[in-house]
Curated annotation (Swiss-Prot):
Binds 2 Zn(2+) ions per subunit. It holds the Pfam family Amidohydro_1. Substrate binds at H19, L20, R21, N45, H140, L223, H255, A267. GO terms for molecular function: dihydroorotase activity; zinc ion binding. The lineage of its organism: Bacteria, Pseudomonadati, Pseudomonadota, Gammaproteobacteria, Enterobacterales. It comes from Salmonella dublin (strain CT_02021853). Belongs to the metallo-dependent hydrolases superfamily. DHOase family. Class II DHOase subfamily. Its EC number is 3.5.2.3. Keywords: Hydrolase, Metal-binding, Pyrimidine biosynthesis, Zinc. It comes from the Bacteria. Catalyzes the reversible cyclization of carbamoyl aspartate to dihydroorotate. It is an enzyme of class 3 (hydrolase). This is Dihydroorotase. Its cofactor is Zn(2+).
């Protein structure tokens, strides 16, 4: 990476965790990802989850149809794990190059996860098949028991689900997605080469005070929820250290304004327009720009066993204001950092 004071030039990055939705929303949000990233791991939690090869092929085509001319973008599809998923269908999708990975949502952990897994034991034959195939398991790492405080769900998941699973299937490749706690940061750091993590810009930039003090800020509400400052700092220190098994995963998750600004709002930050510049700002603040390219563009492909993108992206130190909103057919989207000035932006 070359890093003059005003320009950052890096290999074209990938987004290893994104929600592109469907229908009109998909058509609106896809270009914000396809313009910047060479590839993206696409989450399968649509209203009708992606559980079959045919459904994934059809969804992939809808995504590709929404990619503007001139954008070189490859969506990497994932399979939504359910208690009744057919392991043969999953293996077929992996061998045919349709499924890159499979996603484990604990039932009711986040948006459109009611079809999720009730217990790891229920899908153990599928996970054993994935271990044999070398197919990555992507994990939303939170327990959903009613008695567990929402701020403790990730740490509890490590102890009661993640560690027993990894002890049982020692060669299963696992991505601990959107980690939010010092517990998870330490767990991944202490893990072996079969364990990696993605980290979002919002969890690096903010903590729960930013969301709750002086008025509630619904556009910072996401799941896993923002945690204490000590957890934010642990994540920042992990990426600043140059740790090679952590990589970019925005978890960009658009919801229309009326579904966010309501008495029972949806979880998710639509950060695709400003995420790369947000990451750059964090690395700069941590005096860690030397590790920025690896986090964005190299660590993910290394873990997934994929080639690094051939192209390049330049970020320029050019203060720009994030739009207040983005028009939808019958509503609007409020992007992450709406109305705020960002230091780094992608050169068009």
């Amino acid at each position: 990476m070359t890093a003059p004071s005003q320009v950052l030039k890096i290999r074209r990055p990938d987004d290893w965790h994104v929600h592109l939705r469907d229908g009109d929303m998909l058509k609106t949000v896809v270009p914000y990802t396809s313009e910047i990233y060479g590839r993206a791991i696409v989450m399968p939690n649509l209203a009708s989850p992606i559980t079959t090869v045919d459904a994934a092929i059809a969804y992939r085509q809808r995504i590709l149809d929404a990619v503007p001319a001139g954008h070189d973008f490859t969506p990497l599809m994932t399979c939504y794990l359910t208690d009744s998923l057919d392991a043969d269908e999953l293996e077929r999708g992996f061998h045919e190059g349709v499924f890159t990975a499979a996603k484990l949502y604990p039932a009711n952990a986040t948006t459109n996860s009611s079809h999720g897994v009730t217990s790891v034991d229920a899908i153990m034959p599928v996970l054993e098949r994935m271990e044999k195939l070398g197919m990555p398991l992507l994990v939303h790492g939170e327990v959903t028991h009613a008695e567990v405080d929402i701020f403790d769900r990730e740490a509890r998941f490590i102890d009661t689900v993640m560690e027993p699973l990894r002890q049982r299937l020692t060669a299963l490749k696992v991505v601990f997605e959107h980690i939010t706690t010092k517990d998870a940061a330490q767990y991944v750091r202490d893990g072996n080469d079969y364990l990696a993590a993605t980290i979002t810009p919002q969890h690096l930039m903010f903590n729960r005070n930013d969301m709750l003090v002086g008025g509630i800020r619904p556009h910072l509400y996401c799941l896993p929820i923002l945690k204490r400052n000590i957890h934010q700092q642990a994540l920042r220190e992990l990426v600043a250290s140059g740790f090679t098994r952590a990589f970019l995963g925005t978890d960009s998750a658009p919801h229309s304004r009326h579904r966010k600004e309501t008495s029972c709002g949806c979880a998710g930050c639509f950060n695709a327009p400003s995420a790369l510049g947000s990451y750059a700002a964090v690395f700069e603040e941590m005096n860690a720009l030397a590790h920025f390219e690896a986090f964005c563009s190299l660590n993910g492909p290394q873990f997934y066993g994929l080639p690094v993108n051939a192209g390049w992206v330049e970020l320029v130190r050019d203060e720009q204001q994030v739009p207040e909103n983005i028009a939808l057919a019958d509503d609007s989207l409020v992007p992450f950092l709406a109305g705020e000035t960002v230091r780094w932006s992608v050169k068009k």
